[in-house]
Amino acid sequence: MKVIPLASESLGVRSLALFLKIGKVGILIDPGVALGPKRYALPPAQAEMKALSLAREKIQEYAKKAQIVTISHYHYDHHTPFFEGIYESSSVEKAREIYAGKLLLIKHPTENINNSQKKRAHEFLKNAKEIAKDIKFADSQSFDFGSFTIEFSPPVPHGREGSKLGYVLMVLVDDGKKSVLHASDTQLINDKAVEWIIEKNPDILIAGGPPTYLAHRVGNVKEIGMKNINRIISETNAKIVLDHHIIRDKGYERFFSELDERPLTFAEFLGKESAPLEAYRRELHKLEKGEEVEVPGGIKKFLKGLK
């Protein structure tokens, strides 16, 4: 199995898009990308818009190689909607390119879902059902493709228990030699998700970490996340790849270093330095005005690559 991260915060955008290749079969997991429209009361910097464009190109490129597409929930950084979106780099044409002729294994559109995502799911299905090869609601389901299996968790909270953001699905892909578990937006801060991960004991765990940058709104997620991740480290053999929400916090590296084993970001999994553009949006805007500010080495390399 080839494991190819496509887009995430360590690569400059909001996403946790992943591509898996097993033999001749391509599996595209959570093919969405977005930018936070406001951070520090600022819109995305030019570098973020460029990162969004590059991530969109990558997702479209790998969509052409996929026969199966999975969607954990209906936030726009996890699926590509059928509309023109500036901060999603989306369009009807791009969505059709991703979903047409594919087997879609997706979160149930009306069960264990909040009102916002229910509306998004309705719009998605209204368009996707006309072009997809087949659509299966995947909650708690397993699919056997002969040379590999795809197993989905029951719906688990998007973040903490009782979260108003609804529910997400985790997905485990196993080819008999390697297993990869994509934990989506569980943030590793609810027991249901952690128990399922430990039960499955994957070779690779890919997860969005706790949203520590929102501690003033969501409470003490740092300690909960750290305790749960250390438990996963202790009770599984998983190589942990942690990205998404946690990388929106400038202090993510300190969080990583305090864990019993340091995880990798998507960028590091690919052998690159992390470029957490959103966390440094203030600095990026200042750089664009010609001011001198300090940013991490990975961001410097990303900016240099744009010239």
Swiss-Prot record:
It comes from the Archaea. InterPro entries: Metallo-B-lactamas (IPR001279), RibonucZ/Hydroxyglut_hydro (IPR036866), UPF0173_UPF0282_UlaG_hydrolase (IPR050114), UPF0282_hydrls (IPR014426). Pfam families: Lactamase_B_2. Coiled coil: none annotated. SUPFAM superfamilies: Metallo-hydrolase/oxidoreductase (SSF56281). Belongs to the UPF0282 family. PANTHER family: UPF0173 METAL-DEPENDENT HYDROLASE MJ1163-RELATED (PTHR43546), UPF0282 PROTEIN MJ1629 (PTHR43546:SF4). This is UPF0282 protein PH1002. It comes from Pyrococcus horikoshii (strain ATCC 700860 / DSM 12428 / JCM 9974 / NBRC 100139 / OT-3).
